């Protein structure tokens, strides 16, 4: 194959756009192929639609380059739509129809009535508060979002590079490569206000500029952190599965900006679909000449590699992550030096997370002011959140920075189910904090949350109702943090263990008011002396619950009787008729209280269960039932 030139790149774009236009002349049937919908049986739906349409003489195109004619259909495996709770999802364009909870048994009717007849099947539409919605964009869950990073997820085939090109893919990279200097790229990213989406919120442009200035160093690296370890978080996974080329393009632009020629994507081994789609994206970009040596004759070379993590939460920390890529044990190190000075193999390294890189192409294409016009003055752009817990609509949400918790939980999430009252929301995963009803109207941005003792973190949002004991919530997160501690520094290794023991004593109604002072003292010590950011923020869930929900602790240490824990208890059961045996509940259970065999109904050991609700939030089938006992 001849080497790709700049004019050849333009020709590829023109061809892709023409194929996309031809595709719009026929029905496009999109089956959500995100992990959640696949676990619900989406691939069975896809395969049945494909084979049945073909057997009935309906031409089926499965990629843009396939011929199907106007009488045929384009059947796509799309990226995650975000509304995992109602999967498997099937979208039909241009009829603008979204079907929810689609089963194989529904496919014949979809083919007969909708694909051939153009009719809407009312029973398959999503319904909320008695209202059925045909159009996806009319559903409150989608209507109240502002999608930038997730704009094309759910609307295109992640494994078809031609679609990404047709939607403007890699034009930002071409612009950066041929019309901008490294300094100009870094300035554009800095002026946009883009801050790291992995938790810290450090300005991305400043980080890139720090690496660019190491002009004496010929070897530099771009590293993408896809090690999403927070319980219930799946934002980065959905982007990697649904729009992998946007991540590659962001990394390539960072390479042009800083002079780096090698990139690494560090992905959790538990994300096999993300790894597969990233690998396909890398192979296809390399095949046409967008990755490799002397790209488009520019003299710039860039290669991207995938490194699979072993599932250690601590490897989400920068220095532990780079150590893991190097083949060492993933453990944080003392800083300085920072990764921008001595990162991967001791070389200057840009380390950003998946969502940060996915934002970059849009900024280069549309300009810094476009991006800065979204969000707040100090926190520009949008943020994706994984909305889970005691909320009607769970799933993946993208909103402008500064959106309030009330808008996310009640307007997008649909509020609290079963007529219960809102009690708390935990934001930021194990490094975040718990907020109360009085905080619902605070803007969700880096600075506002910091003042409240919480952080955005990677973007996990766990909603809790009035039947939640906040001491149990604190214990859940401390159990997770203590279990995931790398053990290198004493404050984190021993301090979190002592805090967990204290919390367990309190929950057993064997504690005293002195234990609350002990928790506060331990928290101060760990926060001030732990080696890395994970240890330094490990106590936030405990301290935020102590600050905002102290009465829950007093019930345990003064009354020695918690009306929630010891009054009306909940026994969790898995409904055998709804359980598909996907194992998500077991993977998310911090107490290993759930067991079972793949594709068979799982069971919960209520002696071990701490009623944290992690399984309830993780189950895509609504198979977890909470039975209240007096």
Features from the language model and the residues they span:
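C-type cytochrome heme c attachment motif
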Residues: 581-588, 611-618
């Amino acid at each position: 194959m001849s080497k790709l030139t700049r004019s050849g790149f333009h020709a590829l774009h023109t061809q892709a756009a023409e194929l996309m236009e031809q595709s719009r002349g026929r029905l496009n049937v999109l089956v959500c192929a995100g992990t959640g919908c696949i676990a619900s049986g989406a691939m069975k739906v896809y395969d049945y639609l494909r084979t049945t349409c073909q057997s009935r003489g309906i031409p089926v195109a499965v990629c843009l380059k396939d011929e199907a004619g106007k009488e045929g259909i384009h059947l796509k495996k799309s990226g995650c739509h975000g509304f995992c709770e109602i999967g498997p999802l099937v979208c039909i364009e241009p009829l603008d129809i979204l079907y929810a909870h689609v089963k194989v048994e529904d496919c014949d009717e979809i083919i007969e009535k909708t694909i051939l007849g153009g009719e809407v099947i009312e029973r398959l539409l999503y319904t909320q508060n008695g209202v059925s919605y045909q159009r996806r964009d009319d559903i409150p869950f989608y209507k109240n979002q502002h999608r930038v990073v997730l704009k094309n997820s759910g609307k295109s085939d992640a494994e078809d590079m031609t679609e990404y090109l047709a939607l403007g893919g890699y034009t930002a990279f071409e612009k950066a490569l041929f019309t901008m200097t490294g300094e100009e790229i870094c300035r554009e990213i800095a002026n946009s206000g883009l801050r790291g989406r992995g938790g810290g919120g450090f300005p991305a442009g400043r980080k890139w500029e720090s690496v660019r200035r190491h002009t004496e160093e010929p070897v530099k690296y771009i590293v993408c952190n896809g090690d999403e370890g927070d319980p219930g978080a799946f934002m980065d996974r959905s982007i990697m599965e649904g729009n992998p080329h946007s991540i590659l393009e962001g990394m390539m632009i960072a390479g042009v900006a800083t002079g780096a020629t090698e990139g690494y994507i560090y992905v959790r081994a538990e994300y096999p679909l993300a790894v597969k789609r990233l690998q396909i994206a890398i192979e296809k970009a390399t095949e046409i000449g967008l990755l490799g040596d002397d790209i488009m004759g520019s003299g710039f070379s860039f290669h991207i590699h995938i490194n699979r993590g072993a599932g250690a939460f601590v490897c989400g920390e920068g220095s532990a992550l780079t150590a893991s890529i190097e083949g060492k044990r993933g453990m944080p190190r003392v800083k300085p030096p920072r990764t921008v000075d001595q990162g991967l193999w001791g070389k200057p390294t840009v380390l950003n997370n998946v969502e940060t890189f996915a934002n970059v192409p849009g900024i280069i294409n549309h300009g810094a002011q476009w991006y800065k016009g979204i969000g707040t003055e100090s926190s520009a752009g949008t943020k994706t959140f994984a909305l889970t817990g005691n909320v009607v609509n769970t799933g993946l949400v993208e909103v402008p920075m500064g959106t309030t918790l009330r808008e996310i939980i009640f307007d997008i999430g649909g509020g609290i189910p079963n007529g219960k009252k809102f009690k708390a929301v935990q934001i930021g995963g194990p490094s975040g904090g718990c907020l109360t009803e009085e905080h619902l109207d605070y803007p969700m941005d880096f600075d506002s949350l910091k003042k409240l003792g919480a952080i955005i973190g990677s973007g996990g949002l766990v909603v809790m109702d009035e039947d939640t004991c906040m001491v149990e919530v604190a214990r859940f997160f401390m159990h997770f943090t203590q279990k995931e501690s790398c053990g290198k520094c004493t404050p984190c290794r021993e301090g979190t263990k002592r805090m967990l023991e204290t919390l367990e004593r309190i929950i057993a109604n064997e504690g005293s008011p002195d234990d609350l002072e002990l928790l506060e003292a331990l928290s101060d010590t760990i926060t001030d002396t732990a080696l890395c950011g994970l240890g330094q923020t490990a106590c936030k869930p405990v301290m935020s619950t102590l600050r905002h929900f102290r009465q829950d602790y007093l019930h345990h240490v003064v009354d020695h009787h918690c009306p929630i824990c010891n009054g009306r208890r909940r026994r969790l059961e898995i409904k055998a008729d709804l359980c598909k045996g996907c194992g998500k509940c077991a993977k998310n259970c911090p107490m290993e209280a759930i067991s079972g065999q793949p594709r068979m109904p799982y069971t919960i050991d209520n002696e071990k269960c701490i009623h944290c609700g992690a399984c309830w939030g993780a189950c895509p089938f609504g198979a977890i039932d909470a039975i209240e006992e007096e």
